[in-house]
Amino acid sequence: MQLFDDFCKSFNKELQRANFGFAYNRVHLFYRSQWQKDEINTIYLLYRWIWALFFLGVYIMCVIVQFCDGKFFIYMTNWGFGLCTITMLISAVQVTCWHFDVRSTRSLVQESGHKAETSRGLKIYWWLYNMTLSLALIISTVYWVFLHGKMNKPMRFPAISIITHGMNSVMMLIDFLVIAFPLRILHMVYGMSLAIFFFLFTLIYHLCGGTDEFGNHYVYPILDWNNPNRCMVTFVGIFLLIMCYWVLLFGLYKLKRMFNRAFSVVWSPHAVGLI
């Protein structure tokens, strides 16, 4: 019960207009893992580059084998995986700059007592990460529940499909458990804004006579604008799903912080000496 009460208090504190923004004075958390003790960590640096290069390699392969005269870019799956790639590359570069103190990235933050203002680059990264995380979960859920085996087209690359529709969300969830910077409830609006943008894109694409690579006059069957009622149901459903996932992620973020504090106490020099 105490845990639930603490969650509700934290949730209510999040509902402030300022939390729509990206101001955060503990900027060192954007450069480190939730679980590392020191300011820099070589394992975390390697982790960031392995993640980034994996996403980049898969995305390049997807473009090569699925380009289809540009039809590759009409799908939300490929938007989402592209965002994953960009976000992971930015994170890898930022952690590298912190690790090697490029342009005094780490020194300036340490001199400020870890109270430096959030730079524009970090704000962009935070904004992208929010959209990437929510979009990955939505893509996996919608594909496996509503689209898999129900689309009027053959599955030509099953291995790629598993990576882009399944491993994407698994890897983003793993990364979410690793990173140290916070998740804000009100940042769910950025995932919603991307959903609105994609819905408008599919509508405009339909009105312009656009088709998929097999000649179907829709991007996805559940977004066939010849049946606008179904499209609106899909639209509302996606919004509700984003909200549910974001609240669950906020709870997971709080649990992660709680476990981190517990382990920090257990493995502190004083605690170890008492064992």
Curated annotation (Swiss-Prot):
Domain of life: Eukaryota
Observed phenotype of the null mutant: Flies exhibit diminished fusion of embryonic myoblasts to syncytial myotubes.
Subcellular location, principal: membrane
Membrane topology of the entry: Multi-pass membrane protein
Record localization: Membrane
Listed GO CC annotations: membrane
Entries under InterPro entries matching the protein: Rost
Ranges annotated as spanning the membrane: 45-65, 72-92, 127-147, 162-182, 185-205, 232-252
Pfam families noted in UniProt: Rost (PF21534)
Alphabetized PANTHER family for the sequence: IP08657P-RELATED, OS02G0130600 PROTEIN-RELATED
Protein's recorded name: Protein rolling stone
Lineage: Eukaryota, Metazoa, Ecdysozoa, Arthropoda, Hexapoda
